[in-house]
Amino acid sequence: MILRGEGKSKIFVIVSVTAMMFMQYAAALDLGGIKPVNPLDPRPGTYQDVVNQPSYVLKKGTLSRNAIKNHYTIAMEKFMQSNVRSSYQDFKMLIETVVPSDYVYMRLTQEMASIGFFSLAELSMSRIQDNQISGLLEEDVKNYYFPSYKLNNKDQLYLAEIYSNIMYNEQSKEATNELMKQTKLLTDSDYANYLVAFGSMKNGDIEQAEKSIDIAIDKNPKNINYKRLRAEIYSQSNKPKIALKYLNELNSANINTVVFDTELHSSGQYILYKAATNDYLKKYHLAYYYYDEGELAKALRVLQTSISGKKNINKDVFALTSMVYFDMKEFEKAQDYALKAIDIDSANSEALIVLGKIALRNNDLSKAETYFKKASAKDKTHTAEIKLAEVYQKQNNVKKAKEIYSKILRVSSKAYEAYYKMALLEHDREEAYLKKTIAINPNFQDGWLDLARVEINKGAYDNALSYLGIAKYIDENDYRYYYYLGLLLKGKGLTDDAKRNFETCLNMNPDYEPAKKELKI
């Protein structure tokens, strides 16, 4: 029997790190038993099956077994077991009791909306203090997930349990059939029709899925997630060309943040994988999906079986393989595959960018400049132009670098790296540019570190601690964290603690000159 509830989440934990009350933000929990669906399985899953899993790993910290972790684990287990009312209350308590942090609230806002706990997303959103950092993500969450028809709590929990049963309990047919009996709810609610479409697709009833998703979109034409599902539904129909049409519409969606931009690209690759008829092209898109998801080993395994007799496919396979190897820090292999790609297509921007990055890494500025200039002609992401400006900075041509960054910012609202570089070049606008950087990409660690530096210089140590905590969560092995924490402790007069952190920084990077200077080495 179906009651009322919702479905998946990733979450954060606050853990103490230093004796001076430092709070670190840890990630969502891996509940262990459920693994992402393998799209190559004989019984294919959906994009929702693949991504809607509690798969984030808990970051280690001194309180990694604390009550907050246990609280989250219990809430998520209840949700997956369709004990949605109790799960809702547990998540609500977590939002209300977590140590205040805009970063944590931003993530909770996104994750609660993604599972249909819209009122909890609003609760988390209401606790955010700095709109300069959170505003863009909040707007994306609303455009991507929020229904146009505001559900009362009873209906919200009911639909959440429908989703839970479709998603986790192998009751998609029963749950969908039950929901289709709720005439009043389907008449009013766009989200209810979305769930019928999702459940019907999962059951293989593509005709009903098409009908229901069209109703959902008619009721809420701004919802990006509905449009994403529509493209996926048609990719599994006998009308794949229509799926590609809808996918192209998705590509022009009004997205503000890298978080959702990446989500759309990832789901787009999954839809292309579903729609492709050529086996090699199918594998290429599946590999790109894994690459977008950070599953580099899986991407590489698929790419190794993607080489075909057609050069127009191979050039893209070689370019993507070079990107995977570069991210795996296997630079020689990355270079080899990038060269293979440009042997087929000399203007392949992805391969040229990889070659430029390798040249820049080797301090061959002339070669890097050549590669990035050539790549920028076809690169719509502005990555090549940003890297070209970095080359000019290394050549002490700051004027030329600023011209490029300014040009990018005139045409792109999501070029967070350009905002970041401008922050470092224009100190009178540094804080505003850094906050814009973080607003576009909340997971960009360098932005948080530099915000901490700005606050340390102002003597605003509490703010600096908060920013440092976020930076440490993103990469707990970054030596710069210990350097800036050392500066903070030094500013507070805790010289022994400061010294220990400078020493830790040098243990991690013996060549880091600022830490050497602090220790007078």
Q: Could you tell me what each predicted segment is?
A:
Residues Y25-Y103, S114-S119, L123-S126, Q132-V141, ...:
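N-terminal leader/linker segments that initiate helical-solenoid repeat arrays
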Residues A67, M76, S101, Q110, G135, E161-Y163, S189, F198, ...:
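Residue-level recognition of tetratricopeptide repeat
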Residues L63, T97, N131, L185-L186, ...:
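Structural marker of alpha-solenoid helical repeat scaffolds
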Residues N70, V104, E138, Y158, ...:
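TPR alpha-solenoid repeat register
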Residues M80, S114, Y168, K202, ...:
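Register position in tetratricopeptide repeats
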